[in-house]
Amino acid sequence: MSRGPSSAVLPSALGSRKLGPRSLSCLSDLDGGVALEPRACRPPGSPGRAPPPTPAPSGCDPRLRPIILRRARSLPSSPERRQKAAGAPGAACRPGCSQKLRVRFADALGLELAQVKVFNAGDDPSVPLHVLSRLAINSDLCCSSQDLEFTLHCLVPDFPPPVEAADFGERLQRQLVCLERVTCSDLGISGTVRVCNVAFEKQVAVRYTFSGWRSTHEAVARWRGPAGPEGTEDVFTFGFPVPPFLLELGSRVHFAVRYQVAGAEYWDNNDHRDYSLTCRNHALHMPRGECEESWIHFI
């Protein structure tokens, strides 16, 4: 008669044996004959001895081969890979190490070895007039023993200084903005504007053109300080550059002044005629002795 798993009878020896707490001394006895080599502790990432080499596989195991093959040294590296290697944190050579320099030609990277530019000998170079005038000054200064006389192209205002007019105060009260004076130099055109102090927040700008108002530009003026009795007026300064091609005889610059305050806009355009400057010849005379001791060579 067969018995199921629940009816299995254990030996009496196992049933009468009591299990006590397991002692770990037996494990220590097993390792007692093996002397462990002490290991030195060091923080991770610190320099030290290299790890021991991996033991070679046994004769039964097949020899392992790397999946990724190393690139041949004769192959040129791509520009992207070379840039990444140059920008890597560890790419810089440390002191005392030797770094070999390699030369690569443009054709190895798919580029052209030469760049050809064709010039037509019949085309005359376009030299600005102000450059030619300065070259003529230097040649006259070196080859002549007489006094130096030359002409320069410069912008000259077509109007007298408004601040010197007798009705300047009346115009200022009527327009709330009025141009004081304007000056020209190699750096461009600059000037001052006076406005009535209507409110604290205000803005002054100069709108100018080199093409007869076909295209316009604006230069924002900066506050310089108060003026007038008890600070009822303010003075602003402005400036804008002049391109070299404009320094030709007859070329003109037109501009007007705009004043924005308290949500309103006011203009000073020289009584609807605009302020203008014209490029004209300006004659200069300088004795020979003063030329040799001056900075005329650097004009």
From Swiss-Prot:
Q: What is known of its domains?
A: The CBM21 domain is known to be involved in the localization to glycogen and is characteristic of some regulatory subunit of phosphatase complexes.
Q: Fetch the InterPro entries from UniProt.
A: CBM21_dom, CBM21_dom_sf, Pase-1_reg-su_3B/C/D_met, PP1_regulatory_subunit_3
The reply on keyword Protein transport is no
Q: Name the residue ranges with Low complexity bias.
A: 57-67, 85-94
Task: State the protein's name.
Answer: Protein phosphatase 1 regulatory subunit 3D
Q: Where is this region: Disordered?
A: 1-22, 37-94
Q: Which residues form the CBM21 domain?
A: 169-278
Give the matching Gene3D superfamilies: Carbohydrate binding type-21 domain
Expressed in which tissues: Expressed in all tissues tested. High expression in skeletal muscle and heart.
Q: Which residues carry this modification: Phosphoserine?
A: S23, S25, S28, S74, S133
